[in-house]
């Protein structure tokens, strides 16, 4: 099944931006990149493009080079231009997030079109699109690098499509059980008494507060071992003083 999302770069002049754009779309789960009349016809092989693509060399290699925007939009049913300012006679302008809320459920094959690094999109190219996206930014300086703009649009579109889950902890990490955490807490109490930081005759609320701190940290078993190892080291050095 063809990728229903396409990213189109119009006449990109810097190979590094092409590589960085390939990386930007890959990390958001997309892979269809089309280049319209790039300055360097062999830009996919350029060392700067390859360097900035990093692990996305496959997207860069598959990128298609075409002569016109019409070719780039073949098979696309909804094209979104990108521009800092709306055009007087162009398509309606939206912030990406606002437009994507409805576009994500439309079933369209979507293309996002980006202009040149220096001049952005020409009016005639904007007029070929169904909507124009403007990334909200500082009024006095809202110009983004090409690859940065691609990253923002790719991220917002992925979020509109459901996004990716963020793992709450390191993969395969095993949380320490209550006995292990309490053992670490008891060990630290002895160590703090040993170095004179905690007065057992007037402990106040130090240990309950440390207990809460460890609970919030959701320690793994390995982290408990580290804490106890630190306490043992402190005990050993104190014993030699």
Predicted feature residues:
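Post-transcriptional modification and biogenesis factors for structured RNAs
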Residues: 1-241
């Amino acid at each position: 099944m063809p990728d229903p999302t396409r990213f189109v770069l119009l006449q990109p002049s810097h190979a590094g931006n092409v590589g960085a754009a390939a990386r930007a779309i890959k990390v958001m789960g997309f892979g269809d990149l089309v280049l319209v009349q790039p300055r360097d016809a062999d830009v996919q092989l350029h060392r700067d493009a390859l360097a900035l693509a990093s692990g996305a060399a496959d997207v860069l290699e598959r990128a298609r080079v075409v002569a016109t925007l019409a070719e780039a939009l073949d098979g696309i049913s909804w094209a979104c231009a990108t521009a800092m300012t709306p055009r007087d006679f162009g398509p309606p302008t939206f912030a990406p997030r606002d437009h994507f809320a409805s576009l994500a459920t439309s079933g369209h094959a979507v293309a996002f079109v980006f202009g040149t690094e220096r001049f952005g999109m020409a009016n005639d190219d904007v007029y070929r699109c169904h909507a124009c996206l403007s990334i909200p930014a500082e009024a006095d300086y809202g110009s983004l690098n090409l690859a940065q703009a691609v990253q923002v649009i790719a991220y917002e579109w992925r979020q509109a499509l459901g996004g990716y889950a963020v793992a709450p902890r390191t993969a395969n990490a095993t949380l320490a059980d209550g006995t292990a955490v309490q053992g670490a807490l008891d060990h630290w109490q002895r160590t703090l008494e040993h170095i004179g930081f905690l007065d057992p005759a007037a402990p106040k609320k130090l240990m309950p507060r440390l207990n809460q701190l460890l609970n919030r940290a959701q320690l793994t078993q390995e982290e408990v071992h580290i804490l106890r190892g630190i306490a043992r080291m402190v005990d050993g050095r104190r014993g030699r003083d």
